[in-house]
Amino acid sequence: CADDVIIHQYTGGTTGVSKGAMLTNKNLVANMVQIKTWMVTHLQESKEITLSPLPMYHIFAFTVNCLAMLSYGAHTVLVVNPRDIKSVIKEFKTHKISLMTGLNTLFNALLNHPDFSTVDFSSLKITVGGGMAIQKSVADRWKAITGCPLTEGFGMTESSPLLTVNPLDGSGKQG
């Protein structure tokens, strides 16, 4: 049933004690449909390769990289340790990544690594940041080096997670 709880997703506790959010089938399916509708003009079904440096136990990665992209037929490359910046860069060089999600901290670390500017970003169509505010300076540098806007989204665990996301063309307000 659409209103049945499908998962108890625990919050990060950034605003207090970690809580178990009860997410329903309807929550997750609605978020997947919203994500796919938002990305439809930039991605081709069953042709994309996504880079997922965020852990799947985090609602952002679980919904966007796992559920939405699998339902889109995308191949998802999991990064076991995103703090190992060389391994993230290696995945960019190994696969023609078309979509990446991450946090401002990760994008900044990648931009500051000397090998990052040697990557061919011609296949990168969408980069989405969440989990924290995206700094304008990081977004500007990301666009200058990769040619792809760094799009900021906002959400909460309780909302499965997306509430609002900037336009993919980079025209939205950062931070």
Question: Model segments located where?
Answer:
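Conserved AMP-binding A3 loop
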Residues: 6-33
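Conserved AMP-binding
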Residues: 53-59, 132
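Short beta-strand->loop structural element characteristic of the AMP-binding/adenylate-forming
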Residues: 19-22, 52, 75-81, 151
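Conserved S/T- and glycine-rich ATP-binding loop of Class I adenylate-forming
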Residues: 5, 11-14, 50, 56, ...
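Structural detector for helix-capping/boundary residues
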Residues: 3, 25-26, 54, 95, ...
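Conserved pre-ATP/AMP-binding loop-to-beta segment of ANL
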Residues: 1-10, 17, 42-49, 159
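Conserved AMP-binding/adenylation subdomain of ANL enzymes
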Residues: 29-49, 59-99, 113
